[in-house]
């Protein structure tokens, strides 16, 4: 099972036949195992990693640290449930450290992200403070290394 999961995590487009060839199992056995993993929710989604800059789309990613006042009986979950419903929220994690929640937000520009933080996130009951960090460049995402464009060389420094 774990070998199938690793292969699909690396390339979600692999067919049961390709996986069967690599694992020495039958295609039918692999297909049944994948179906079982999907039904159990182990495999949640097949997703492409897209370089939006190369696609010519304007996308801005921001990491937002959120300090939350936990509520009795539910902790951080009540606030997290409200935050995850926003379509702009790409991912949401409970974290250790100085902040409680880590929000990855996708927007079309910095102004849109700022609006989300000021008008949607910060006013939520239980949110005490936020800190926003904009992604300036992506080197690796979901295990995929983004090739870097050749930058013009620096001029030599002479004294």
List each model region and its residues:
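A compositional/biophysical signature of low hydrophobicity enriched in polar/charged and small residues
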Residues: 1-159
């Amino acid at each position: 099972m774990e070998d199938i999961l690793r292969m699909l995590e690396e390339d979600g487009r692999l067919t049961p036949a390709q996986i069967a060839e690599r694992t020495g199992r039958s295609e039918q056995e692999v297909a049944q195992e994948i179906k079982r993993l999907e039904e159990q929710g182990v495999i949640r989604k097949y997703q492409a990693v897209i370089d939006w800059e190369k696609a010519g789309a304007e996308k801005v990613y921001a990491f937002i640290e959120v300090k939350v006042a936990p509520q009795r009986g539910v902790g951080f979950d009540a606030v997290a449930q409200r935050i995850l419903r926003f379509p702009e929220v790409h991912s949401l994690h409970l974290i250790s450290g100085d902040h409680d929640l880590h929000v990855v937000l996708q927007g079309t520009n910095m102004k849109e992200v700022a609006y989300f933080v000021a008008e949607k996130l910060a006013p939520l009951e239980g949110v005490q403070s936020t800190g926003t960090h904009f992604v300036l460049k992506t080197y690796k995402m979901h295990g995929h290394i983004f090739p870097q464009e050749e930058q013009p060389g620096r001029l030599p420094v002479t004294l």
